[in-house]
Amino acid sequence: MNCYKTHTCEELRKNDVEKEVTLSGWLYRKRDHGNLIFVDLRDFYGITQLVFNNDKDFFDEISNLKLESVITVTGIVEARTEDTVNSSISTGEIEVIVNNLRVESEVEFHFDEEIAKEERSILVSITGEQEYPENMRFKYRFLDLRREKVRNNIILRSQIIAELRKLMIERGFLEIQTPILTASSPEGARDYLVPSRLNPGKFYALPQAPQIFKQLLMVSGFDKYFQIAPCFRDEDARADRSPGEFYQLDLEMSFVTQEDIFQIIESTLYRVFAKFSRKSVDKDFPRITYKEAMLKYGSDKPDLRNPLLISDVTEIFRDSGFNIFKSNIERGMVVRAIPAPKTAEEPRSFFDKKIEHAQKEFGAKGLGYITFDKDGTAKGPIAKFLDENRLNHIREATNIEPGDSVFFASDKENEAANIAGKVRTLLGSELSLIDDNIFRFCWIIDFPYFVYDDKSKKIDFFHNPFSMPHGGLKDLEDKNPLDILAYQYDLVCNGIELSSGAIRNNKLDIMYKAFAIAGYSRGEVDTRFGALVRAFRFGVPPHGGIAPGVDRIVMLLADEPNIREVICFPMNQQGEDVLMGAPSKVEDKHLRELSLKVIE
């Protein structure tokens, strides 16, 4: 028999009345009624009410014991009276009359009063009564994790990962681990570097993704690979991005098309989202080209819950009487229109605040608006410069109705798309147009293969350099590089990018040509990607893959606004682990072993 417990704190029911039981857990709440003390004992599974009578010799001990101390009790189960039943907990019909108490571990506050004050205050948060600054929560994460909501997020994460793993195995995928210490790669973010003691002056890199390894597995003859892969990128924190490390459902398949991968991911994620959320899950995963996404939504991560669609109204304003937009168009710029339903009767301050916000927060320049009264009359600072024919074209292009308004953004094409997209998001939120009770997915496809980098003044890869271009080698040789599309795709849910993937290039001549366009010599390719180049000489199957982000999936299903809430031991926004004190300085002898020196 277990000396610590016969039952968990969630198990006991009315049919256990008169049984002698032993329970262990944390002293969660305590209520002193003079001759009786009621204690809520909490373990991982639930809560049970304990009753301590003042005729017991341990009454003073429990009276003075601090909350969150760990105890073991033995006692008799009794039914609560009808008026004291607690329906909010599963054990609410019973209580345990304690006959024996053993203190396993008592809370002891730090001798420094300032630190002790901090420790006492953070204990209060465990009952859910008060929130604390993120750094304090992370410093005492072992206490923060005792909170029901935080604990449930970590349990949910475990359950989701188990379900993903089960579904992958059901579909014939093999779980294979790839190296953590590897070579630096041009994934687009900064690497975390690890110095080699045995090879002075050389460094390993923590993998930004298992990209090359999973392609090598396909070359090796494995048909379907997956792993819950840890990835490491030295990036700044965001609400949907944790600094340092993250996890993804990394997978790769041989002899597949883009649609084959879509079908696997759609069926997998639909089952996971439907199982772990009470929200509706849209079964439709529409395919939207990158070009269409940037035009209609102003983003390659569109939130399809937002019904607003952006329109291109450049031609309507060409040669118009509104000189600001007319001049912009003559200089090669565009004009985008964003509808704002049922806002025509809003005061002018409503529109001025939106424009001011867009200017300050989005860097917007050419902005304006038109309101269309219920009788159809157009008003606003732009309306007087447009004839009725142009106004009708705006009504048709934006599909608005009387009583609606339209915001406009004019700039270079990419900038105008970005600004219009942010205005669309702002309006969708402030006008309460977004349904928070549904998950809507979409695929973004046909990304550009290359992009012109204004800073370096050269062509570079838009996304993954190992993807297959549309048209293969012929397009690389014959087309303007900026017109070439790639078999690359992103999966988006409610405006959050869950995953990127691609059909891979499996031919050396295409690889060399693509990298040549991006400014890499054949020798540089051989040096930087030697393993892949060697492998590609020995028969490479057509293959492709994808890697949905586990942290973001859990964040969405937990309905948390910040990804750090679903990570067990997260870093703060500065990339610091305040619990363990990382990053930290190391001793000089360790640096000497690694042939390193810190320059102040």
UniProtKB/Swiss-Prot annotation:
Gene that encodes it: aspS
Predominant location category: cytoplasm
Marked site: Important for tRNA non-discrimination: H33
Quaternary structure note: Homodimer.
Keywords carried by this UniProt record: Aminoacyl-tRNA synthetase, ATP-binding, Cytoplasm, Ligase, Nucleotide-binding, Protein biosynthesis
Keyword Iron-sulfur among UniProt keywords: no
Protein name listed in UniProt: Aspartate--tRNA(Asp/Asn) ligase
Catalytic activity: tRNA(Asx) + L-aspartate + ATP = L-aspartyl-tRNA(Asx) + AMP + diphosphate
